UniProtKB/Swiss-Prot annotation:
EC assignment: 5.4.2.12
Gene Ontology terms for molecular function: manganese ion binding; phosphoglycerate mutase activity
Organism lineage string: Bacteria, Bacillati, Mycoplasmatota, Mycoplasmoidales, Metamycoplasmataceae
Name of the protein described by the UniProt record: 2,3-bisphosphoglycerate-independent phosphoglycerate mutase
Cofactor(s) this protein requires: Mn(2+)
Gene Ontology CC entries for this record: cytosol
UniProt enzyme class: isomerase
Organism: Metamycoplasma hominis (strain ATCC 23114 / DSM 25592 / NBRC 14850 / NCTC 10111 / PG21) (Mycoplasma hominis)
Binding-site residues for substrate, renumbered to this chain: H121, R151, D152, R182, R188, R253, P254, D255, R256, K326
Length: 499
């Protein structure tokens, strides 16, 4: 059986327009060769094609879920939205229970999360529905702690959501008590010093005490500090977390919610102990945060027989390879949102640089990823790997840095292509991406665009004897299994794109 390399480029979509398109403005001779000489097609990577609402931008979690599952996976955003649409959100047992207990104990319910309409980690609508539910049940003591986005949405976009939130809080008698940028509140690289600053603001122990949230946002903007990087601050008249209170974390995506959750209720994931630990009565997450013992409001779709399981069942040695920023995506998310290591599975984690902005280091750890691939390909049969550059640098909205990231990625692809060309009888290379981003780094006004896109993505195969049709991310696994002449499991509803 041929060895397979499945490379997932993070955040590189296909778009014809040149303006703001880092890919089209970059020099990429290896990509040019692959597109001109190898079978290739186009895959949909957003909206209903990946289990999201129509028109919703794709993201790394959803992209890897769909690729690994071989079917459309309906994720937290769709599940929660559907509950709101069919009017069952108000009947959610876990949400009602935490509200009832807060009323009974005469304590405070704190609702925290990313205030964004991006729909990648959270959706502002979910916060609003929680507040409406609490008010309908007569809960008077509710405090809201918001995190600025500016990454999956425009850098200065919090105000629209904030206006709606302020109106609801004024109507219901609730408080907005703290604000932090996601850079602090949602770190996922174990840089707990960042989380600690957000945690302090939520506990009312921040060094930054502000009178008015709108004035504070304007003051941050004047300093060139936008939503993602808001310095954590607490409102002078805020209501802060104390012993016996309860928390609802309304982010539905887990990877950037785990560290802050750990600080409130502990876990076996990390050893960090926060300063000024509080005892939380009830801690609720809208979806499951793997490794965090929260009460889960909405249960996710179970993925049976993802690609990794099929490889295990066929005694195929597999390697998962990524740098820190995307390691969870080629493991946890690729395996259907389950933390499992299969028989004959190897894993290599390449450390990501711990920097404030990857615009300053657009190469990231791409060279080390390639080194690891070439050093380990002989020991494995199926390599699932991720390059993070286009997405992580694209999120900065820095066009020149993103161009450099793509050009460096192209040089790494050249190294892989040389190996594959020399060993083409034994190795086939499949290339795709999980969603778009780097192809739109500037908007129509030449301002930085930092969010994901709805662009389709590439699907390339270096075996020139095949023909590829167009499809969606869920078709990648069935296609590769068909190529290997392995029957796909019945649960994989994606189709082979081999013609």
């Amino acid at each position: 059986m041929k060895k397979i390399i499945l490379t997932i480029i993070d955040g590189l979509g296909l778009r014809k327009e040149r303006q703001g398109n880092a890919y089209l403005q970059a020099k990429h001779p290896c990509f040019d060769y692959l597109f001109s000489m190898c079978p290739n097609s186009v895959l949909q990577a957003s909206g209903q094609y990946v289990g999201l609402p129509e028109g919703q931008i794709g993201n790394s979690e959803v992209g890897h879920l769909n690729i690994g599952a071989g079917r459309v996976v309906y994720t937290g955003l769709s599940l929660i939205n559907k509950a709101i649409e069919n009017n069952t959100f108000k009947d959610n047992e876990i949400l009602n229970d935490v509200i009832d207990k807060t009323i009974k104990n005469n304590t405070t319910l704190h609702v925290m999360g990313l205030l964004s309409n991006g729909g990648v980690h959270s959706l502002d609508l979910h916060l609003f529905e929680i507040l409406k539910l609490a008010h309908s049940k007569g809960l008077k003591n509710v405090s809201v702690h918001v995190f600025g986005d500016g990454r999956d949405v425009k850098p200065q976009s919090i105000k629209n959501s904030l206006e709606t939130l302020k109106d609801l809080c004024q109507k219901f008698g609730y408080k907005i008590s703290s604000i932090s940028g996601r850079f602090y509140a949602m770190d996922r690289d174990s840089i707990f010093s960042r989380n600690q600053e957000a945690y302090d603001a939520i506990l009312g122990q921040s060094k930054n005490v502000i009178e008015n949230i709108d004035d504070y946002i304007e003051s941050q903007y004047k300093k060139g500090i936008f939503d993602e990087f808001f310095e954590p601050a607490q409102l002078k008249d805020g209501v802060f977390v104390k012993n016996g209170d309860s928390i609802i974390f309304f982010n539905f995506r887990p990877d950037r919610a785990r560290q802050l959750s750990h600080m409130f209720i502990g876990s076996n994931l990390y050893t960090y102990k926060p300063k000024n630990q509080v005892q939380i009565d009830n801690f609720v997450s809208l979806m499951k945060y793997e490794g965090i013992n929260s009460k889960i409001a909405f249960k996710e779709m179970e993925v049976v027989n993802p690609l990794g399981k099929v490889l295990e069942s066929n005694d195929i040695k597999q390697l998962r390879l990524a740098e820190t920023q995307k390691y969870a995506h080629v493991t946890f998310f690729f395996d259907g949102g389950v933390d499992i290591e299969y028989k004959n599975e190897n894993r290599i984690l390449v450390d990501s640089l711990k920097v404030d902005s990857f615009a300053d280091y657009p190469h990231m750890s791409a060279k080390e990823i390639t080194d690891s691939l070439l050093n380990n390909i002989e020991k494995n049969d199926f390599i699932i790997m991720n390059y993070a550059n286009p997405d992580m640098v694209g999120h900065t909205g820095n066009l020149n840095a993103t161009i450099e990231a793509i050009e460096f990625l192209d040089s790494q692809f050249q190294r892989i292509l040389e190996y594959v060309s020399l060993n083409h009888e034994n190795v086939t290379w499949f290339i795709t991406a999980d969603h778009g981003n780097a192809e739109i780094t500037e908007d129509e006004n030449n301002k930085p665009a930092t969010k994901h896109t709805t662009s389709p993505v590439m699907f390339i195969c270096t075996d020139k004897n095949v023909n590829l049709g167009n499809g969606s991310l869920c078709d990648v696994a069935p296609t590769i299994l068909d190529y290997l002449k392995i029957n796909k499991p019945k649960e994989m509803t994606g189709k082979s794109l081999l013609k």
